[in-house]
Amino acid sequence: MARIAGINIPPHKHAEIGLTAIFGIGRNRARKICDASGIAYSKKIKDLTDGDLEKIRVQIEQFTIEGDLRRETTMNIKRLMDIGCYRGFRHRRGLPVRGQRTRTNARTRKGPRKGAAALKK
């Protein structure tokens, strides 16, 4: 099993798909990494040589991924909440941030419905 950036990449998947197991790498970025490394998208992870894996590691080091990316995202949201802007307020209240309606829908962000009894209290 190949290990890249502290993540075990599924060996039976194609290189393009397997790289998406790393947080911060989607299909588009995985294709760019494969192109820069000279690896075919359809090549299975288990068929990659150590040299190929090292080329991929070198390419991935150019991007912010995994823990660093999660930390950066969290810090950006925290900064918005600290400066007291509208977006920070919406994050703090657990409501949609990008202008979506909340009278109906928005259940993903607001959580499960509160019954009529809970609203009367």
UniProtKB/Swiss-Prot annotation:
GO terms for molecular function: rRNA binding; structural constituent of ribosome; tRNA binding. GO terms for biological process: translation. The keyword rRNA-binding applies. It comes from the Bacteria. Residues 94-121 are annotated as: Disordered. Keywords: Ribonucleoprotein, Ribosomal protein, RNA-binding, rRNA-binding, tRNA-binding. Disulfide bonds: none annotated. One of its GO terms (cellular component) is small ribosomal subunit. Located at the top of the head of the 30S subunit, it contacts several helices of the 16S rRNA. In the 70S ribosome it contacts the 23S rRNA (bridge B1a) and protein L5 of the 50S subunit (bridge B1b), connecting the 2 subunits; these bridges are implicated in subunit movement. Contacts the tRNAs in the A and P-sites. HAMAP family: Ribosomal_uS13 (MF_01315). Part of the 30S ribosomal subunit. Forms a loose heterodimer with protein S19. Forms two bridges to the 50S subunit in the 70S ribosome. Belongs to the universal ribosomal protein uS13 family. This is Small ribosomal subunit protein uS13. It comes from Verminephrobacter eiseniae (strain EF01-2). The gene is rpsM.
